[in-house]
């Protein structure tokens, strides 16, 4: 079985911690993964994998995390044809209700526009926010985590989502 490549960026450590938990859980389930901090990785490295997990928190007012922002131009030019990816991100649905999880949308939409298949959608119903670029009907384009207001739900959400994407990846 081919490995899954996980690429993430983090300023405060929340996204890094979630990525580490997710990797540990997936590997405990027999899924082989490689993990990359996007701060130290050329985005073209993603093209070496057929399956990706991409993690990015929403930063400031609806912006990408610093390292993702730095490579975003190059990311948007990649051809993701034949690649399947799941997205997850941290946000604050109370303090930033008008742009909750926007980073998932900022990364997920160009991924699909450039030929990629997006999996791992997550229902919006458990969240209280006003607007999100990650929203697609009654789903987000990926898993939303809110350690600022619902930290007690983070591990449970990660486990449920990991089981979902394992099935969707076919692993």
Describe the residue ranges of each PLM region:
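A short beta-strand-loop structural module common to alpha/beta enzyme folds
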Residues: 30-42
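Iron-sulfur (Fe-S) cluster-binding modules
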Residues: 1
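Short, surface-exposed acidic/glycine-rich loop or hinge patches that mediate macromolecular interfaces
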Residues: 9-13, 40, 58
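FMN-binding flavodoxin-like domain, especially the glycine-rich phosphate-binding loop
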Residues: 25, 29, 48-171
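Short acidic/polar alpha-helix capping motifs at helix-coil junctions
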Residues: 4-6, 36-39, 71-74
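N-terminal beta1-alpha1 ligand-phosphate binding loop
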Residues: 4-25
């Amino acid at each position: 079985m081919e490995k899954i490549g996980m690429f993430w960026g983090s300023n405060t450590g929340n996204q890094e911690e979630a990525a580490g938990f997710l990797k540990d859980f997936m590997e405990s389930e027999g899924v082989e993964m490689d993990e990359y901090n996007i701060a130290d990785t050329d985005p073209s490295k993603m093209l070496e994998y057929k399956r990706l997990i991409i993690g990015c928190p929403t930063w400031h007012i609806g912006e990408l995390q610093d390292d993702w922002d730095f490579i975003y131009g190059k990311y948007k030019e990649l051809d993701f044809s034949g690649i399947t990816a799941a997205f997850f991100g941290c946000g604050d649905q109370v303090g930033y209700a008008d742009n909750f999880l926007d980073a998932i949308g900022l990364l997920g939409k160009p991924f699909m526009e450039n030929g990629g298949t997006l999996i791992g959608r997550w229902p919006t119903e458990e969240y209280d926010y006003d607007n999100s670029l990650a929203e697609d009907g009654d789903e987000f384009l990926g898993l939303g985590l809110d350690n600022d207001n619902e930290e007690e739900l983070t591990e449970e959400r990660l486990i449920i989502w990991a089981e979902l994407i394992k099935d969707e990846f076919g692993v």
